[in-house]
Structure formats: structure tokens, C-alpha cells
Amino acid sequence: MKNLFRKLFFSLTIILFNSIVADAGSYPDYTREKNIHNQITSYIFDSDIVELSSKLEHKFNLLATDSSSDTSILLLHGRGLHPSEPNIIDPLRVDLINVGYNVFSLQLPVLEKGKSYNDYFKIFKFSDTRIESALNYINSKKNIIIAHSCGAHMLLSFIDNIGIGNISGIILLGAGAVDKDQVMKTDINLSSYKIPVLNIYAQYDHNSVKQFADVLIVQYSSTQDKYLNTLEVNDADHNYKDQTYILIESVKKWLKAL
């Protein structure tokens, strides 16, 4: 009887421990975010760093440049990065500021390095409410979201769980990227929202990104010319190395035509 009790107690202890570990893994890495904050505050001079809060969190950053335009652009970075990451988000941010748009770039929740799409999926509830808070703060007549990679996953989660809200248009960059042997868990038909979408992917992008591009084309098959534009950037990889200029010019051309 004592041995049975010990085995039962040991089993319950393991279950409780695994539950605690799993729960701990479903929160952003705030230490890493604090380090990011300390780094970017030393070199960001063209934007205000605004501290926002959400239903789930007390403090996270939004880079904000208000140019008194009717159009605001919210940038969502890729996995584990920050609102001024140098490959895609910051070049876009600076160039769009120079054009005269109101430009905002949100710190999305991050995990420790090496985490996969499936790990990040567990914290999408935090990105949902961060995006909601950012859009409430911006509150422009026309709100466009540009989202890269995991930022695109988080945007789709936001739309699926909270709604399209006051979003006027979407630009997806490298959307649909997942790790090997993983699949997208957010099942959403963007065509039902009837807003303009520009989906950009690279010639040498991940297979999952190209598969998602095909899914979008099928979703928009009846209204494709009206709402969906698709662009493949030649000689580019997922981070558009050496092709950032073409990416930015394509984005600006689409925005101007809205």
C-alpha cells in the first residue's frame, strides 16, 4: 500500500511539474524584451518610443512617428526580432516616414532564441492584444498593416480572434513560414473580409510561404483582381537580402494606388 501511495504521489508530482513548465512556456520572454528595449533606445532618434498596455500585459513598446497624414502604417516584425530590425522593418519604416505616412512599429512578444512556430503559437494571445492596443492608439482614418514572417502569423491570429477592426489594407511579407514538419494552426479565409491585400514572397522563400501564396490565390479566386495582389521578388530570400530596395518600391507603389 505504501509503495502504491508513493507511486501515485510521484506520478501526480510529475504531472503537476509538467503542467507548470508548460504554463511557463506560454508567456513571452520579458527579460529578452527588456534587453531589446535597452538596445533600441540608444539609437532611435526619428520616432517616439511609446509604452502601451493591453488586456494581458502592462508594458510593451511602439515606435511612433506621426506625420499628420490620414494614412497610418503599422509594422509587425518577424520571429524573435524587434521594431527596428535592420533587414526589412527598419528600411521600410524609415522610407515610409520620408514619404510622409504616419509610421508605427510594434514590439511583438518574443521567446528565447531557438523556439519554433509551434512555440510561438502558444503566445499569440499576447500578440492579439498588443496589435489591438496599437490600433486603438493609432486610430487613423486609414490603417495599413505590413507584417513579415511570424508577424504575419500574429496578424492573422489577431484578425481570426479579435476581428478586422479598423484595418484598411494588409501587406504580407513571407507569410506562412513554419518550421520543418510543422503546419499553420490559424485557419482563416482573408477573402471574406473584403479588404485590399498585397502578398509578397521571395523567389527563394520557404516552401511553406509559397504554399500559403497558393492558398490565398484559391481563397480569392472569385474576387482576386479586386482585392488580392501577389508579387514574387526575384533573386531574394526570406529576408530579402540585397533586394530590400525592390521590396520597398513595390510596397510604396501599392500604397500609392490605394
Where are these regions (language model features)?
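N-terminal cap/lid segment of alpha/beta-hydrolase-fold proteins
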Residues: 25-66
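Classical Sec-dependent N-terminal signal peptides that target proteins to the secretory pathway
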Residues: 2-24
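Serine-hydrolase catalytic machinery in alpha/beta-hydrolase-like enzymes
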Residues: 56-61, 66-137
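Gly/Ala-rich beta-loop-alpha elbow adjacent to hydrolase catalytic centers
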Residues: 146-156
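The feature captures the conserved acid-bearing segment of alpha/beta-hydrolase catalytic domains
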Residues: 174-232, 237
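Active-site signature of alpha/beta-hydrolase-fold catalytic machinery across serine-
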Residues: 157-161
